[in-house]
Amino acid sequence: MDPQARKNQPSLLRLICRARKTIRGSADDIGWLQHAPGMPPVEDGTKRFMELLESIRNGEHKLPNSMIYLLVPGLFSNHGPLYFVKTKMFFSKMGLACHVAKIHSEASVEKNAREIKECVEEIYWGSRKHVLLLGHSKGGVDAAAALSMYWSDLKDKVAGLVLVQSPYGGSPIASDILREGQLGDYVNLRKLMEILIRKVIKGDIQALEDLTYERRKDFLRKYQLPKELPVVSFHTEASIRPEVLATLSHVAHAELPIIPSLSARQPRKVPVVMPLSAAMAACAQLLQVRYGEKTDGLVTRRDAEVPGSVVVRPDRKLDHAWMVYSSLNDDPGEADASQVCEALLTLLIEVGQRQRHEISMKDG
């Protein structure tokens, strides 16, 4: 072999490796939990959820005041006080004790898990009531981590967990943005996603680091949710209709790179007023085109299903930021975030009651 060719061989191999990594992206990781050995199957609870939601919209409320309800916010907690506050007020008007966990979305999963554990203990010791947790987005991952890591301390204090649009298995957006060694046009695609997500979460892009497939696989190898814990998973997909992408509002802003003209050397940046819904729709469309996966703009439906959980798969188009902006523009013809949370927690209580009955039948 020519010496120069031999010298260039490692560089060529690295280039091939980078090209393969770029092209495949997250294709081999999406839905990995569904094929992982030893994972328990899920159960479809969509029909029962819809029945409970309809009853709630007709004024029938079943959540007991013998529990404390802890809401755990996720990546959009930086959008201010509207996030989960309306749901807390909604619960309070029904005479229910409801708290919102004070965690920072940009903190690591392990750090937030510790803080959630301490929050649950404080609530329990102050009330002597069991706690039901509902986490949205990364908040669901953080809450699940708390119960996985500290179950021996929390098993007599926690009655169940709901994960709403949570990337329990990981997120292709997180993995694709943070993956190194990408080439060509995919770098521009990555940059577009990064611009959208950075503006949407209003924080450090490293907040996504613990949500990459690599990080989630590492974590779940060490910690898994206890089998006796009642768990409900809820996931949706975003609407990517043209009118959603075209909608403008004041909620979030993005600077989108404009393709330079022939006479211009540098691409111009134009500030574009972009609502959360449009940013999520844009991300959902990118993921649909690249991977053929239905997502809420951040999380694929398959990655949001926790093994062994009762899964709710509504047909209604809801993106990942819906919990935030539903407080701003509720459609009276549809259930709002507070009602959805109530229905999910009611379903969780039913799941827990059924599990306890099954255990007692076995013991009997």
Region spans (language model):
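Serine-dependent carboxylesterase/thioesterase catalytic core
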Residues: 113-221, 296
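Flexible, membrane-associating and regulatory peripheral segments of lipid-active enzymes
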Residues: 1-84, 89, 93-94, 353-364
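Acidic-and-aromatic substrate-binding clefts and catalytic sites of carbohydrate-active enzymes
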Residues: 77-81, 104-111
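Conserved alpha/beta-hydrolase
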Residues: 86-106, 162
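Glycine-rich His-Gly loop
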Residues: 72-75, 137, 166, 236
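C-terminal catalytic-base region of ester-bond hydrolases, centering on the histidine
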Residues: 226-364
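Short aromatic-enriched loop/helix-cap "lid" or pocket-rim segments at secondary-structure transitions
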Residues: 83, 170-177, 242-247
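Short coil/turn segments at beta-strand junctions that form active-site/ligand-binding loops
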Residues: 67, 127-131, 229
